[in-house]
């Protein structure tokens, strides 16, 4: 090994090893600079605009009128009282609006795809394109919120669910457009391509609050935070068990607080993303960064995931004081492949309690993909104070590339009561273990007889 390179590695590793304690001051700095939205005093009750919470009447016109009135008054609060409000089509936000669902209120969207046309600019699995409108869509807005104790139902378990088996052509076309740098204005899919819309998408927005609502039955991802910043998501709950029902997907997102959320999802609870392949790498100036996840209850496929669409990079993620309240396949899961490029770095996870999982902690550069030549850089990942009752497959997995190893991984105070496989580490360097127990703890050696 080149001596100067060895010295650099030694200094780099020593620096990380000395500073891998959970950086609470950095967390506080992120949380303190996130701005909550502020709204004018204007309020409008949708009942005054002809809405009926009878589960039958189409209330699309009344909700559109409410948004228009808020825009005319430079913002305000739209009040949705108790009742079931059917809406045949999307809600499109304007700036400075709080959509407040009172206790007992439910918005129930139609499941007719043509209700979500004309197409809007959106993103689908990391590729920008035109597609069906998300059910709730905010584009280039500021100071916006969805609050209250009501429910949003995406009616995703019927027509939208059937799209999953038909999406192959549209999915491959979107990826080809990404890889071939087709201008976004020419990426028009929508009707006939079977790409399901997100339930809620904030796109190029800032100063966002989602608080205390319940999300059910999404067609696709539930809450997509796309190219947005200064975001607070707290106190919400889920029961959304359809295909690809991720709970929260920050993508190219900055300064995000996710706290006190109770998940029950058909896919990842939180999946941090940053664009896919060529398009993501071209946006490397806007990685997903400064994301705090704390005091959450996990249930679904995976607890916290980074990737696999993360080509612009993900950095400065802080996860603490979370636990499972039901099944998870994997607890913490970092995944990428040789298509992606980009980086995953400065990830700190502490005080996590898991029950039974398939894999407890999993870092892989070998997630399935279509190409090669763009290995991701995974470094500076710290896990501390993690407990798990049972891992039916593996306790800890670390998988890098032969020519770009995963590096600087700290595992401290890890207690996995039972695991079929304890630790599997391939193409990794500078892995520090301190107080790591998998299975029964060894005792002092017995004397020879």
Whereabouts are the PLM-identified features?
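Bacterial Sec-dependent N-terminal signal peptides
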Residues: 1-21
């Amino acid at each position: 090994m080149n001596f100067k390179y060895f010295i650099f590695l030694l200094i780099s590793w020593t620096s990380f090893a000395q500073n891998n304690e959970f950086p609470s001051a950095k967390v506080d700095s992120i949380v303190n600079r996130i701005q909550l939205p502020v709204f004018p005093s204007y309020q409008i009750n949708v009942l005054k605009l002809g809405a009926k919470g009878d589960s039958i009447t189409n209330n699309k016109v009344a909700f559109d009128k409410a948004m228009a009135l808020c825009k005319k008054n430079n913002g305000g609060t739209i009040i949705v009282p108790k009742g079931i409000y059917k809406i045949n089509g999307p809600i499109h936000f304007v700036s400075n609006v709080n959509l407040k669902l009172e206790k007992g209120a439910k918005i129930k969207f139609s499941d007719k795809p043509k209700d979500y046309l004309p197409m809007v600019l959106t993103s689908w699995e990391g590729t920008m394109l035109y597609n069906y409108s998300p059910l709730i869509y905010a584009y280039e807005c500021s100071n916006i919120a969805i609050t209250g104790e009501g429910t949003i139902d995406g009616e995703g378990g019927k027509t939208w669910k059937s799209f999953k088996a038909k999406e192959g052509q549209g999915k491959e076309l979107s990826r080809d457009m990404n890889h071939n740098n087709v201008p976004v204005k020419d990426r028009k899919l929508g009707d006939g391509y079977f790409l399901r819309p997100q339930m809620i998408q904030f796109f190029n927005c800032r100063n966002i609050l989602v608080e205390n609502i319940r999300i059910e039955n999404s067609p696709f991802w539930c809450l997509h935070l796309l190219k947005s910043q200064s975001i607070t998501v707290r106190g919400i709950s889920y029961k959304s068990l359809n295909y690809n029902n991720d709970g929260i997907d920050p993508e190219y997102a900055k300064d995000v607080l996710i706290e006190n959320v109770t998940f029950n999802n058909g896919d990842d609870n939180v999946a941090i993303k940053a664009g896919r392949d060529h398009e993501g790498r071209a946006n490397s100036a806007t990685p997903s960064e400064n994301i705090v996840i704390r005091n959450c209850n996990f249930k679904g496929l995976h607890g916290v995931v980074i990737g696999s669409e993360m080509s612009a990079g993900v950095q400065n993620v802080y996860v603490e004081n979370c636990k499972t309240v039901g099944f998870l396949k994997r607890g913490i899961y970092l995944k990428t492949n040789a298509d992606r490029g980009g980086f995953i770095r400065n990830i700190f996870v502490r005080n996590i309690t898991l029950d039974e999982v398939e894999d407890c902690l999993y870092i892989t550069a070998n997630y399935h993909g279509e190409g090669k030549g763009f290995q991701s850089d995974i470094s500076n990942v710290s896990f501390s104070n993690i407990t798990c009752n049972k891992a039916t497959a593996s306790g800890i997995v670390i998988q890098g590339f032969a020519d770009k190893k995963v590096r600087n991984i700290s595992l401290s105070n890890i207690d996995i009561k039972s695991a079929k496989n304890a630790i599997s580490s391939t193409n990794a360097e500078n892995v520090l273990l301190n107080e790591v127990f998998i299975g029964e703890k060894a005792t002092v050696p017995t004397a020879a007889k």
